[in-house]
Amino acid sequence: MFVTAAYAQSTTTEGAEAHDAAAAGEVHTETGVAHEGEHGSGVFPPFDSTHFASQLLWLAITFGLFYLLMSKVIIPRIGSILETRHDRIAQDLDEASRLKGEADAAIAAYEQELAGARAKGHSIADTAREAAKSKAKADRDGVEADLAKKIAAAEARIGDIKSKALADVGAIAEETATAIVKQLIGGTVTKSEIAAAFKASAGN
């Protein structure tokens, strides 16, 4: 009886251990991890050669999705942006060229107008200079003619005054000479005699 009970207990213990081992094997099978993983080689899973096939598959799928995203979305959008910028740059260059042409034309017109204004200014200055010279010459000629007339009139007046003065001096001299002769010799002389005497003295 005692032996039978001990045998039954050992049998029960062995059965429990076998059941636990079977359960552990099922758990490892369901998780996809080998039982020897607990005591395994310690290799990092991405570097494990048993996983290369699945890694290559996911790499191909990821690359394909990335290629589709690039070719269908990103690259067309970048191309559209580049084309828009290219068109805008071309328009800006055309506008800059047009503005440069307008600026060059405006500068040429300004220089032409400036040259015309300078030529007109020189012409006006030359005309004014010639007109001033002509007016100055005419004024000078008029002044000289006026002075010549005044000088001629003054000379004529001076001649008249001189002639009158000389005539008065002759009469005074004759009267003085008559008075002197009368006082010296007590006689009288005629004006003709005194005039003849003055002429004779003037001739000497």
From Swiss-Prot:
InterPro entries tied to this protein: ATP_synth_b/b'su_bac/chlpt (IPR002146), ATP_synthase_B_chain (IPR050059)
Record GO cellular component, one term: plasma membrane
Domain of life: Bacteria
Pfam family, one: ATP-synt_B
Keywords: ATP synthesis, Cell inner membrane, Cell membrane, CF(0), Hydrogen ion transport, Ion transport, Membrane, Transmembrane, Transmembrane helix, Transport
Membrane spanning stretches: 56-76
Membrane topology: Single-pass membrane protein
GO MF, one annotated term: proton-transporting ATPase activity, rotational mechanism
Subcellular location: Cell inner membrane
Broad class of where this protein is predominantly found: membrane
Family per record: Belongs to the ATPase B chain family.
PANTHER family from the UniProt entry: ATP SYNTHASE SUBUNIT B, ATP SYNTHASE SUBUNIT B', CHLOROPLASTIC
Subunit composition and interactions: F-type ATPases have 2 components, F(1) - the catalytic core - and F(0) - the membrane proton channel. F(1) has five subunits: alpha(3), beta(3), gamma(1), delta(1), epsilon(1). F(0) has three main subunits: a(1), b(2) and c(10-14). The alpha and beta chains form an alternating ring which encloses part of the gamma chain. F(1) is attached to F(0) by a central stalk formed by the gamma and epsilon chains, while a peripheral stalk is formed by the delta and b chains.
Function per UniProt: F(1)F(0) ATP synthase produces ATP from ADP in the presence of a proton or sodium gradient. F-type ATPases consist of two structural domains, F(1) containing the extramembraneous catalytic core and F(0) containing the membrane proton channel, linked together by a central stalk and a peripheral stalk. During catalysis, ATP synthesis in the catalytic domain of F(1) is coupled via a rotary mechanism of the central stalk subunits to proton translocation.
Name of this protein: ATP synthase subunit b 2
Organism in which the protein naturally occurs: Sinorhizobium medicae (strain WSM419) (Ensifer medicae)
Encoding gene per record: atpF2
